[in-house]
UniProtKB/Swiss-Prot annotation:
Keywords: Calcium, Developmental protein, Differentiation, Disulfide bond, Glycoprotein, Heparin-binding, Host-virus interaction, Membrane, Metal-binding, Neurogenesis, Receptor, Repeat, Secreted, Signal, Transmembrane, Transmembrane helix
UniProt signal peptide: 1-20
Gene: NRP2
Protein's UniProt name: Neuropilin-2
Bias (Polar residues) ranges: 298-310
Domain notes: The tandem CUB domains mediate binding to semaphorin, while the tandem F5/8 domains are responsible for heparin and VEGF binding.
Source lineage: Eukaryota, Metazoa, Chordata, Craniata, Vertebrata
Organism for this UniProt entry: Homo sapiens (Human)
Amino acid sequence: MDMFPLTWVFLALYFSRHQVRGQPDPPCGGRLNSKDAGYITSPGYPQDYPSHQNCEWIVYAPEPNQKIVLNFNPHFEIEKHDCKYDFIEIRDGDSESADLLGKHCGNIAPPTIISSGSMLYIKFTSDYARQGAGFSLRYEIFKTGSEDCSKNFTSPNGTIESPGFPEKYPHNLDCTFTILAKPKMEIILQFLIFDLEHDPLQVGEGDCKYDWLDIWDGIPHVGPLIGKYCGTKTPSELRSSTGILSLTFHTDMAVAKDGFSARYYLVHQEPLENFQCNVPLGMESGRIANEQISASSTYSDGRWTPQQSRLHGDDNGWTPNLDSNKEYLQVDLRFLTMLTAIATQGAISRETQNGYYVKSYKLEVSTNGEDWMVYRHGKNHKVFQANNDATEVVLNKLHAPLLTRFVRIRPQTWHSGIALRLELFGCRVTDAPCSNMLGMLSGLIADSQISASSTQEYLWSPSAARLVSSRSGWFPRIPQAQPGEEWLQVDLGTPKTVKGVIIQGARGGDSITAVEARAFVRKFKVSYSLNGKDWEYIQDPRTQQPKLFEGNMHYDTPDIRRFDPIPAQYVRVYPERWSPAGIGMRLEVLGCDWTDSKPTVETLGPTVKSEETTTPYPTEEEATECGENCSFEDDKDLQLPSGFNCNFDFLEEPCGWMYDHAKWLRTTWASSSSPNDRTFPDDRNFLRLQSDSQREGQYARLISPPVHLPRSPVCMEFQYQATGGRGVALQVVREASQESKLLWVIREDQGGEWKHGRIILPSYDMEYQIVFEGVIGKGRSGEIAIDDIRISTDVPLENCMEPISAFAGENFKVDIPEIHEREGYEDEIDDEYEVDWSNSSSATSGSGAPSTDKEKSWLYTLDPILITIIAMSSLGVLLGATCAGLLLYCTCSYSGLSSRSCTTLENYNFELYDGLKHKVKMNHQKCCSEA
C-alpha cells in the first residue's frame, strides 16, 4: 500500500523532466546596435538563470569614434567561487581575444564600464550547479558632453556654470572649461553656488567617487591638480598667475544635483622692481582657506582643530589627539610658492586657562603632497627653536628661500602639550620682474616642443620633464654619461626674454629590474638660441667662460637659477654633475615677452637674515647611495649659501654678507681717490673703511652667510687694500659656536694697489661663518677696502694661500689696535637685513649677527687645559726634532754620504696649514759636510 503513492511521485517527476527538456531554451546573445539604448539580462532575470548557459553579445556603436558605456542594475547575483563556474565577462573589442575589462560574479554589481573603442564583447557562462538571479545592464553611446559644455574663456571676466544651471545637470558629462589670461594677468576664480552629488562614505577632502569638479593649474591632466571638489562645500577663492586655469566637470549615470556657478576675473599684475619676498601668505588673514589646512590628527573634543592654527587666533589652536613627534600640521599653498620664514605661537585653553606651546619643531616640504623632504642642517635634520611661552610669537627665517607647495610642521618638544598657531612668509615666483612661467608646468608648451639628446624609455621621455606636474621626469639613455654630453631642450615657440630656469629632480628607473631611481642634477650649464642652430652659453661675467650653475640637492625640491636677461626661443640645459642615481630632470623656463623686458637688477632671494640658516643637503638614503665610492668630486658639489659670492655692485642686490653700513661705505671705483691698477666701469662698487687722525678709531666686521663644509675645503678669493701703516689691520676669522679661529691677517701698509687674497675655507663638522675684521687704530689715519668675495672652483687648494705672509704660525702674535667704541653695532647690522614686521606684534627671537662676545680676539677663547695641551705638544715636537737632527748628523758623518745622497725633501720647507702642505722653495744648500 505504501509503495503505490511513491511510484506515482517518481513517474510525475520523470515526465515533468522530459517535458522541460523538450522545451527549447530561450535564445541569448547576438549583435546589438547602441544607437538606441537597450538592456541585456541573464536568461530568466530576475528569476534564477538556467544551468549550462553560454551567451555572447557584441555591442557596437554606429560611428567609429563613439564609445559605449555599460551600467549594471544593483540587483546582481551570480554564483561566487572566484568566478570559476558562473560569471559575466566584458572585453574591450568584438571577440574573446580582446582586452579584458572585467570578470564578475557574486552579489556586488560591477561599476560603470566604458569602452575605448566602438565595440564591447560580453559573455555570460553558467554550469550545472547552483544558480542565482543573474544580472541586468543598460548599454548606450557614451556622451561626454564636450560638444555642449566645453568652452575656453578669454574675456576679462565671465561666468562658468554647469550645463543646464540652475536646473539639474545631465548624466555622463565630461566637460572642460579653460580660462586663458594674457601675460601680466592674474586669474581670480570665485564660486557662488556649489551643489554636486555627495558621497556619504567620503573619507577626506578630494575623495569623490560619483560627480566631481577638478581644478588644474594649467591644461587638464598636464598641469598640477589644485583640488577635487564634490558635495555641497563651496571651494574657496583661487588666484592663479601661471596664465591658464582649467576646470573639468564629471558626472555619472546616477544622482543629479543643481551644479555650480562661478565667476572669474582677470586682474593686471605688475611686479615691483624692488620687491621683498617676505609677505604673510595668509594664515592670519584668512587668505589660506580652512580646506587648505590639515593635520595628522585632532584632539577628540573638537575644540583644537587644524583650522584654529592661525596666528593670533583667539580660539585655542591646533592640538593632535596624542602628543607625539610623529604628529604634524600641514598647509597646502595650492601653487608653487617661495617660503622664507615661519612664525609660531602657542595657545591658552579658553576652558582651563592652561598654556601649551611647542618648544622645537622640524620642517618638511613637498611639491605634490607625496614626496617629502625634511629641511636639513648639514647631514642632520634641522630642529628649529620655537616658543618659550604660550603667547609669544617666534619667527624663524630660512637661510635660502624654499620653492614648495605643501608645508608640514612636526613638533619635537613641547610644554604641557602640543598647541600650535602659525603664519608662513614668502612670495610667488611671478612676483619678480620678468619671471613668468613660460609653459612647461602649465602645458602651454606642447610635448612636441620638448626634445632631448637621448631618452631612456618612453616613460621618461622629454615630455615627462614638466616641472612638478610629472611624477617621473626625463632620463637620458645613458644614466652616467659624460659631462655636457646630454641635454634637454625647450622650444618656446616665439622669441622671449629669458631670465632663469627652475630645475627639479625626477623619479624613474629600469623597467626590467623595476628599481626606482631618485635622480637629480647637481651642476649644469645653459645655452640659448634664436634659430635653433647658432647656440651661445650663459657666461660667467667674472671668467667669461660658460657659467656652471648649482643644481638640486634633492629629487623633489625645485631650485631657481637666475641670470641676466637674454633673447631666446630655444633653451638647452646641459647636466655637468649629478646624483649617484644618474641624470634625472624636470624643468621650467622663466621670462617674459621680448618687448616687456627692461634692464633691472633684482633677485628672488629675501632680505631676511637670521641664525636659522641651513643649506639643504641630500637625504640620508641619497647620501649613502654611493657608499665608500663617494669621491672628492662629489664633495665639491656641496652647495654654498646663496649670496656668498658678492661684489657689492648694486644697492638692490641683497648679498648674503652682513655689515655695518655706517662704517663700511659702498664706494664706486670712479669716485674713489685710492689708486688702483685696473679699469672698471663707473658702476663698479667696493666696501671701504676709512679714518683720519682726528677720529677715535674704526672697527668694523663683514660677516658671511653660514657655511657648512663637512667633507672638503674650498678656496675663497677676494681683493683688498690696506694703507696707513701699523695702525691698520685686516684679518679673516672663522667663527663657529663657542669657537673662533684666525685664518688670515695683514697688519702693515700694503701700498695703494689692489691685491688678491686667497684663503682655504677648511672642512668642519659644524656650521660656521667667515668674518672680515677691519681695524684702524685710535689717532691713526688709514683706509681698508674689500671687493669681489667669491668661492673659486678653478684654483687648486695648494695655490690658495695668498699672500703667504698673511698666514700666522702657531706662535704668531696678532698686533691689533684696541677699539672701545662698538656700541650699537649688532643692532645696526640687524636693521639692514631685518624684515619689516611693523604690521604684526610678532616678537622675533635671535639675531642676524653674532653676539659681541664672539667679537673678542680668538686668543681669549683658549682655556688653561687647551693651553697646557698645546705647550706639551710643542715640547714633544721640539724633542723629536732634536733627536731627528742628531740621527741625521750621525748618518751623514759616518756613512760617507755626499751631498748628492741627500733626499730632495730637504730642498723644501713644508708648513702645515689646516691639513694641507704648503711648499716653499729654498736655496739649494749642502746637507752634509764633505770630508
